[in-house]
Amino acid sequence: MKHDPQFRALTPKWHQGYRFQYEPAQKAHVVLYPEGMIKLNESAALIGGLIDGKRTIAAIIDELHQQFPNVPELGMDVDEFMEGAKKKNWIDLV
């Protein structure tokens, strides 16, 4: 996805019934939902950990850029995560 300021102005929040947490048995962060669980990779877990219903996508990207200043494709990675999570109904974008 190409950088889209309108898209990045949206605020992600976990869809009702979905919860992000660390799952010790999986030794990973997961998204829990009524029908099961999705194990996240490290990158997705970093992004998911910043979804709080208050930060915009742009703010999440800025926060991650502070932690990882030498990753130029980070913004595109966040955009792709948000698009995929929205399509799978993990998150709502408001």
Swiss-Prot record:
InterPro entries per record: PQQD, PqqD_bac, PqqD_sf
GO molecular function, one term: quinone binding
UniProt keyword terms in alphabetical order: PQQ biosynthesis
Disulfide partners: none
Pfam family, one: PqqD
Gene Ontology annotations of biological process type: pyrroloquinoline quinone biosynthetic process
Pathway the protein contributes to: Cofactor biosynthesis; pyrroloquinoline quinone biosynthesis
Subunit comment: Monomer. Interacts with PqqE.
Functional note: Functions as a PqqA binding protein and presents PqqA to PqqE, in the pyrroloquinoline quinone (PQQ) biosynthetic pathway.
UniProt family annotation: Belongs to the PqqD family.
Protein name: PqqA binding protein
